[in-house]
Amino acid sequence: AAKARLLAVEAVHRCASGHPGGSLSVLDVLTVLYFHTMRVDPQNPADPDRDRFVLSKGHAAVGYGPVICDYGFMPVEGLHNFNLTGSKFGMHLDKNKIKGIDCSSGSLGHGLSLADGFALAGRVKGQDYMVYCLTGDGELNEGSNWEAAMTAAQFKLSNVVVLVDNNKCMIDGRVDDEMKVEPLDKKFEAFGFKVKRVDGQNMKELNDAIEDAIANHKN
């Protein structure tokens, strides 16, 4: 995670743009997912049985890109031109340009719906993979997230794991000053989710929570 942080900060400095705060706050969980949890292979990025990942808070691309590169999907040199004209790495990552990306991002509020779609598609095709969706507390002031949460519960999509970056900040300021979303744990529980609050910079807590979610799906 420390290496990815350095790459992210360097990319922001070079292109003089980006969303460093919301990117740096997710690098620990991205590191746990890619380097410990997810079944993904840079040599076979389109493996139909791979786990899926959706970066719903797509503006964290300057943090996601370094992880993708460090894991071997793309050469790290590509980050040297992050968000510059002609670069494959833009402010939002494009799955048609970056290997290892399951879906492109853009407008906030749609990632969990995409994750539900991945899970339902796998069920129809008889495939059993995990789907991880990383969202943020600021993003959760959009109602489409809660419609997607209701859908996941309705169809018992236990292989969908929602990871909320509860950093309490958004581009307009503090989340509570814009739209209060807490208590997030009680809200998700009301929709039928099993919820665990952890320290987002504690690798063990993150790993244990994700492993619990996987075990819950398998059981």
PLM regions: where:
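A short, structure-level motif marking secondary-structure boundaries and short turns
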Residues: 1, 15, 49-50, 133-134, ...
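Electropositive phosphate-/nucleotide-binding environments in soluble metabolic enzymes
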Residues: 2, 6, 23-24, 58, ...
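N-terminal capping segment at the start of a domain
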Residues: 2-17, 165-167
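Cofactor-binding active-site loop characterized by glycine-rich and histidine/acidic residues
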Residues: 11, 23-147, 153-154
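Short, surface-exposed helix-loop/turn micro-motifs enriched in polar/charged residues
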Residues: 18-22, 45, 198
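Conserved alpha/beta enzyme-core scaffolds, especially Rossmann-like or related mixed alpha/beta domains
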Residues: 20-23, 134, 163-166
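Thiamine diphosphate
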Residues: 84, 88-96, 114, 118-120, ...
